Amino acid sequence: MKLRVGQTLGTIPRQCEVLLLLLLLGLVDGVHHILSPSSAERSRAVGPGASVGSNRPSLWALPGRLLFQIIPRGAGPRCSPHRLPSKPQFWYVFGGGTQLTILGQPKSDPLVTLFLPSLKNLQANKATLVCLVSEFYPGTLVVDWKVDGVPVTQGVETTQPSKQTNNKYMVSSYLTLISDQWMPHSRYSCRVTHEGNTVEKSVSPAECS
């Protein structure tokens, strides 16, 4: 379409205005897909402005009621609703256009179980206490050990949080002593701090007899 002398952008049809904008930006060759609402169901959106396999910033235009991402040739299409969510969330478009939104998993307090050393462990001249912490979310916490009320760090080993099948987390913490160190003390405690709350479990060598 040719522009007549004196014709302004305000009189140009909307489609031509968008095309002219792309020409001015020099991005016509980079436009691969502009999605319509009917084609959105065939795309899977990772998130607003996200592009799988690329960390480069994305350019968005607003020709209508959708936000469209201008992406390089060969990349898959992406689109998102015009009204973006006000707080962070994960969302996907899949199947026949069904959108799944995960607003955030609720907090879950940890379940703490403290295990005494096994008889076989003690016969090998070792005493390993196991503090199993499970069912917590978010997946960050602190595990501390005490012997007769005194904090200890020597002989302590704690695993990194691992995700359970229910999307909650679990960790294991170990306190390893030699048998001679195990018997003289009366109380061993595992203390877990999660989201400002503390859970403590204790055992005694007398419980092994």
Swiss-Prot record:
Q: Which UniProt keywords apply?
A: Disulfide bond, Endoplasmic reticulum, Immunoglobulin domain, Secreted, Signal
Give the stretches traversing the membrane. none
> Does the entry annotate any disulfide bonds, and if so which pairs?
131-190
Q: Which CDD domains match?
A: IgC1_L (cd07699)
Give GO cellular component annotations, separated by semicolons. endoplasmic reticulum; extracellular region
Signal sequence region = 1-30
J region: where is this region? Answer: 93-104
Its quaternary structure? Interacts with VPREB1A. Interacts with SYNV1/HRD1 (via N-terminus); this interaction leads to increased IGLL1 ubiquitination and degradation in pre-B cells, possibly through a lysosomal, not proteasomal, pathway.
The job of this chain, per UniProt, is described as: Critical for B-cell development.
State what protein this is by name.
Immunoglobulin lambda-like polypeptide 1
What is the scientific name of the source organism? Mus musculus (Mouse)
